[in-house]
């Protein structure tokens, strides 16, 4: 997910730095874990998967997977199981799995939910227009960009909709208990969550696009206060971030 450029020329302001070396950020180590600690907390926002009336359960055969990917598939399934993000299931639902290569050379396990998405009633919650961000940031001189860690796994799925997330694999059938990458309405629900968390700071010093948070200020003194307020909100709501993908104190 992208946010507007700050024209800072900085590729990655945290490269080669430790968290404890960065002003303000060093006071919030718990917001930047190496991995998500487990299931997200209960909150009043849960993902619902409302279907077109009359829809029957959809099940697709697993895709064939090259043997060289099987060890990675098993590893990622075991990791998801250990966190409680998925669980074994016997279900009439089932979407196939595949891998997508990421920029850092790792592989993202993806579920092909296209058939489910076709029969899902679309959530029309508005996503912001990138162009609007520039008006809000006019006059700002100091910026920080915060990227949530595995953002989609930080929201739970409504209990009765969990079976619809079932996916098939060589190692069995599983269902997600948290939001899964690839479901049609996930950006809308995540935007709803972020708007609720940061609403009081909008049009002042924060813009949010799905799982990217941009903090902007007119001075370093302001930015110290603004960044601290944002990190306090993240800690309060147990929303975790990926330190290596963040940028702080850009000018």
Describe every region a protein language model picked out.
Residues 4-251:
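Retroelement reverse transcriptase polymerase core
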């Amino acid at each position: 997910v992208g946010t507007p450029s700050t024209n800072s020329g900085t590729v990655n302001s945290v490269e080669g730095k430790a968290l404890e070396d960065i002003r303000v950020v060093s006071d919030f180590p718990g917001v930047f874990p190496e991995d998500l600690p487990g299931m997200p907390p209960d909150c009043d926002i849960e993902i619902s998967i409302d279907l077109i009336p009359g829809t029957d359960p959809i099940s697709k055969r697993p895709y064939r997977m090259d043997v060289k990917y099987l060890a990675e598939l098993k590893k990622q399934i075991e990791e998801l199981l250990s966190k409680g993000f998925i669980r074994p299931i016997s279900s009439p639902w089932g979407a196939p799995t595949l891998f997508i290569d990421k920029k850092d050379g790792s592989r993202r396990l993806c579920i092909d939910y296209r058939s489910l998405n076709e029969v899902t009633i679309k959530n029309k919650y508005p996503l912001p227009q990138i162009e609007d961000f520039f008006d809000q940031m006019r006059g700002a001189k100091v910026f920080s960009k915060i990227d949530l860690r595995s953002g989609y796994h930080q929201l739970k799925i409504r209990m009765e909709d969990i079976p619809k997330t079932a996916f098939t694999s060589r190692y069995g059938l599983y269902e997600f208990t948290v939001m899964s990458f690839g479901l049609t309405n996930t950006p809308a629900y995540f935007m709803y969550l972020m708007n609720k968390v940061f609403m009081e700071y909008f049009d002042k010093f924060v813009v949010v696009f799905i799982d990217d948070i941009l903090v902007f200020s007119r001075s370093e003194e302001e930015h110290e206060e603004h960044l601290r307020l944002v990190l306090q909100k993240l800690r309060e709501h147990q929303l975790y971030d990926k330190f290596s993908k963040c940028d702080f104190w850009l000018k």
